[in-house]
């Protein structure tokens, strides 16, 4: 039997770089919220112990794909602790809507959905804490998708505190470029000393993203989309880009602006949600 699982996008409602560690990783403060929009992952169980991704992602080797790595990691961890039946495997396919290098967390979300779904389908019985710990070895953003609740994140993004920001409507626009995260984090002009503040203080301040100034400077497409959106609503970069988003109180307001968008602006309208669609599907 084939089952389908949501793999939602996320937005960074704000993102501040507070320092850089000796190992080169940046410390940050950010606010994650999910969107009711994303990829869909389909899983069909196998009984020969094999993991097969039936829909390869262009430019990514099969064994390097986060979906495959997540499945193999869960398989090994569960088998080593005697919590996996012999022969457990899976055929996995993905209906991909989220762009790569867009700052929407697509790859991390895919990995998290596979961990959560296969843990359920294989009846491994691993806790969310165990799955989140495994997810962190795959990427800093994976744990928030595993846990499935909007969160304030610190450290390198791994220290999570559940929060409930307002669930606004967003027009999310993709400028048509992919921004590799290292391009932003290696830029010498990236602000790296934003003062740390409490979540209570941050929620009262106007939200912004320290990476935005670099993305706009290095990618004129990002600058063009943001300049257009800012004419209509508060707008900013998500993650390290390339996607940007404008914030609205209602769906109709967001759709009215999207309808006026120039042809070169590709976007969609989605609602911010504090409970991940993946976890909502499991209730």
UniProtKB/Swiss-Prot annotation:
Key word Iron present: no
EC number(s) stated in the UniProt entry for this protein: 2.7.1.148
Gene3D superfamilies reported in the protein's UniProt record: 3.30.230.10, GHMP kinase, C-terminal domain (3.30.70.890)
Key words, A-Z: ATP-binding, Isoprene biosynthesis, Kinase, Nucleotide-binding, Transferase
Reaction(s) the record says it catalyses: 4-CDP-2-C-methyl-D-erythritol + ATP = 4-CDP-2-C-methyl-D-erythritol 2-phosphate + ADP + H(+)
GO biological process terms held by the UniProt record: isopentenyl diphosphate biosynthetic process, methylerythritol 4-phosphate pathway; terpenoid biosynthetic process
InterPro entries, per database record: GHMP_kinase_C_dom, GHMP_kinase_C_sf, GHMP_kinase_N_dom, IspE, Ribosomal_Su5_D2-typ_SF, Ribsml_uS5_D2-typ_fold_subgr
Function, in words: Catalyzes the phosphorylation of the position 2 hydroxy group of 4-diphosphocytidyl-2C-methyl-D-erythritol.
Assembly with partners or alone: Homodimer.
NCBIfam families, alphabetized: ispE (TIGR00154)
Protein name listed in UniProt: 4-diphosphocytidyl-2-C-methyl-D-erythritol kinase
Organism: Escherichia coli O6:H1 (strain CFT073 / ATCC 700928 / UPEC)
Lineage of the species this protein comes from: Bacteria, Pseudomonadati, Pseudomonadota, Gammaproteobacteria, Enterobacterales
Gene: ispE
